[in-house]
Design a protein with these regions (language model features):
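Catalytic cores of phosphodiester-bond hydrolases, prominently lipid phosphodiesterases
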Residues: 25-305
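Compact beta-sheet-dominated domain cores in extracellular/mature segments
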Residues: 304-547
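Classical secretory targeting signals
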Residues: 2, 13-16
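Bacterial N-terminal signal peptides that target proteins for export
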Residues: 1-9
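Cleavable N-terminal signal peptides
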Residues: 11-12, 22
């Protein structure tokens, strides 16, 4: 039976749904070591022309937590706090470094006591000049991150960093600048980047922005030849056993455009492609035009896990990523979350807890008379794991998940709605899917709950079941002792044919009843047709479901 959905019903369902926001929360947990987080990081952060015309305070508000800043001496400074200015190759300058610290970063950190910010300094100043500036900013000392304040075995968690108020990390590209700067008896610590992290070469993407995909180079050579990207630990001189951080550079170092950034540089597929070529999960993702494209969703997926949708079957790395959806309970409208409509054909799961249920629908209102897939996660899926569901049109029973597909005319490339929730306990979600063809083929007619006792007429019911259409069923889930009876008579009398189906043991994986015109028994069910054939003639149902 071809289902028609009135436009008003579709619009109402979408508007009423609890749509997850496009900009997800930065992190769901603050109890992982710092090296297990990823952060949006802006290249030449002070140049708003390359950052969607947004100054650094706006970037902070939008969730940016890494900032690349170039600092130069100001030979015309008349006061110590003006000794250093922020410039791009001395061609364009953007004011005093102290002003940005005092008026932008310090107020943000004071107002947000759980947040951590990292500043990457491209340094053209001396220690004395930096000391002059720091000495005018005593508040920095109370915010500065100092590794000496934490045990040697691992990076502190975000919560531990917040508890000690060590929430502003300074990294410099010059070893002679690194060290402690004493201000009123307290240190401001600047770390030498090559001791603590690795980077890919920032120049591979090319000098100029371009709308030609082949002009982009997604390879991932290391920036420093003596530090392979897979270098595991920080430098021994740090006296720490901490994991090295990774800054993944993904920007054109000459010009950038919002169009190129959105289509290529900050596109989910190409961010993932760079990561795959690097072979390391980034802690910092350095980009231009951070608000164009999907870098925020990409980073959210790395931090919090998510549902990754792919354009092709198999969810393989060669396929384009449609989008990543954060795992938040509710209804996800794909378009509102950056997903192209009717594109996805497979998915992978990361960082998802046991007991999560994900349901994908063809119908935007979630009508179960059309194609839908129910996925129950059976074990915790790690944040760095990609658990693949290769197609939306298969029943699958795996150690990590169970997928039940109720077919109408196909779901691949047609997903319009996703619901995220919890797997019901026991047999609370027991159900039967009825089909218009034998062997659970042709159109899906309706899905009926099998967890209670109820009767219904086929042409007048709340499930959408049709009169004189049903020929087979798929028992999705059922408790032993449940049964149902179908009759050819519209009032449920037995004189126009009847078939009883008894559940002999718990059914937790889909079981097909290929026809209601036969009599048979196996370990799972007893099917009894009483004399007259009823396939395609069913008009009434008695449901006796147990839970």
């Amino acid at each position: 039976m071809k289902k028609q959905y009135p436009l008003v019903a579709i619009v109402a369902a979408v508007c009423a749904s609890v749509t997850l926001g496009a900009h997800a929360a930065l992190v769901d947990s603050r109890d992982k070591p710092f090296n297990e987080y990823s952060w949006v990081t802006t290249h030449n952060s002070y140049e708003k022309i390359n950052q969607n015309l947004k100054e650094m305070p706006a970037q902070l508000k939008d969730g940016v937590r890494g900032f690349m800043i170039d600092i130069y001496p100001d030979t015309n400074a008349v006061r110590p706090e003006l000794a250093i200015k922020v410039c791009h190759k001395k061609l364009a300058c953007y004011g005093a470094f102290s002003s940005q610290l005092k008026n932008e970063f310090i107020p943000f950190l004071k107002a947000n006591p759980s947040e951590v910010v990292t500043i990457f300094l491209e340094t053209y100043v001396s220690r004395d000049q930096l000391q002059q500036v720091f000495s005018t900013l005593p508040d920095l000392a109370s915010l500065s991150f100092n590794p000496a304040n934490f045990p040697a075995a691992r990076w502190p968690t975000l919560r531990e960093m917040a508890a000690k108020n060590n929430r502003l990390i300074f990294l410099t590209d010059k070893s002679e600048i690194a060290g402690d700067y004493m201000v009123q008896g307290k240190p401001i610590t600047v770390l030498f980047d090559q001791d603590w992290l690795v980077q890919n070469d920032w120049s591979t993407l090319g000098l100029m922005a371009t709308n030609v995909e082949k002009a982009h180079n997604w390879s991932c050579p290391t920036r420093w030849s003596d530090l392979p990207l897979k270098t595991e630990l920080v430098d021994p001189s740090t006296q720490k056993q901490w994991k090295r951080l990774f800054l993944m550079n993904q920007f054109h170092h000459g010009t950038s455009t919002t169009m190129d950034s959105a289509k290529y540089d900050n596109n989910m597929t190409y961010l993932q492609r760079r990561q795959d070529n690097c072979g390391v999960v980034p802690n910092f993702v350095g980009v231009n035009n951070y608000a164009s494209g999907e870098v925020d969703r990409y980073v959210s997926g790395l931090n919090n896990g998510g549902i990754y949708l792919y354009e092709g079957n198999g969810a393989t790395k060669k396929e384009d990523i449609v989008c990543v959806i954060p795992v938040k309970a509710g209804v996800v409208n794909r378009k509102a979350n950056g997903c192209e409509n009717d594109e996805a054909r497979s998915m992978s799961l990361s960082g998802i807890s046991k007991g999560t249920r994900i349901t994908l629908y063809d119908n935007p209102a979630g009508d179960k008379q059309d194609d839908h897939l129910i996925v129950d996660v059976l074990r915790d899926v790690r944040i760095n794991e990609h658990l693949i569901l290769p197609s939306f049109e298969q029943d699958r029973s795996e150690p990590a998940y169970r997928a039940v597909f109720n077919r109408n005319n196909g779901l691949n490339g047609k997903v319009s709605r996703i619901e995220i929730g919890k797997t019901p306990q026991g047999f609370a979600d027991a159900s039967i899917a009825f089909y218009e063809g034998n062997n659970a083929s042709q159109n899906l007619d309706c899905v009926v709950p099998f967890n209670s006792h109820h009767n219904f007429k086929m042409k007048s019911n709340s499930f959408g079941c049709s009169n004189d259409e049903i020929r087979s069923a798929k028992i999705i889930k059922a408790k032993a002792g449940s049964m149902f009876t179908l009759t050819g008579h519209p009032e449920g009398r037995h004189n126009e044919g009847r078939t009883d189906v008894e559940i002999l043991r718990d059914i937790t994986a889909p079981l097909v009843i290929p026809s209601f015109d036969h009599r048979y028994e196996n370990l799972d069910v007893r099917v009894t047709n009483h004399t007259r054939h009823i396939d395609g003639k069913i008009s009434f149902g008695y449901i006796r479901g147990e839970k």
